[in-house]
Amino acid sequence: MKNLKMASIHDIDWSLWRPVDRATLTFIVKDGEILLIRKKRGLGAGKINGPGGRLESDETTLECAIREVQEELIITPLDLTECGCLYFQFTDDYSIHVTVFRAADFEGQPTETDEAIPLWFKVDEIPYEEMWADDILWLPKMLAGESIGGRFLFSDDRMLDYELE
């Protein structure tokens, strides 16, 4: 894709697009609150997000979602529901396909790890200003029970363009 001059989502031929990585994000919503994390390292370090990460070669997206929540928060999400997929292209040629899950319950006690700090927020007080710029576009839809989907173009952590499905 080597096109550092991408400025619009329409500069990308999505029919040929193949992500560098595949990943998951999981949002646990219980009793009017959402469990988020402050990411300590990796892509999005310092930002607030849902727990998640890259798929390993031998696992499904569901297995990845469970593993990542277990690794980042020392809990096990229960009854995960797939909510949709998000496609991210960065101007430095990195790209990632993210499958988003939602869970209404979990086993264990959310615990800080070397990867993440657990944070609970009321669903109407989500700190979007501390999150990736795209989250405010699709997370409310997911919380309302809608399927989500979208394509996003970023330069570092700045969103240049997007298209929701």
Identify the role of each PLM range.
Residues K2-L25:
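Acidic, metal-coordinating catalytic segment for phosphate/diphosphate chemistry
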Residues K30:
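A cytosolic small-molecule/anion-sensing beta-strand core signal
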Residues A45-K47:
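A positional/architectural concept
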Residues L55-L78, Y87-M142, D161-E165:
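Unchanged
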Residues G84:
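Catalytic phosphate/metal-binding cores of nucleic-acid and nucleotide-processing enzymes, i.e., regions
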Residues I148-E165:
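Acidic/histidine-enriched, glycine/proline-rich intrinsically disordered or flexible terminal extensions
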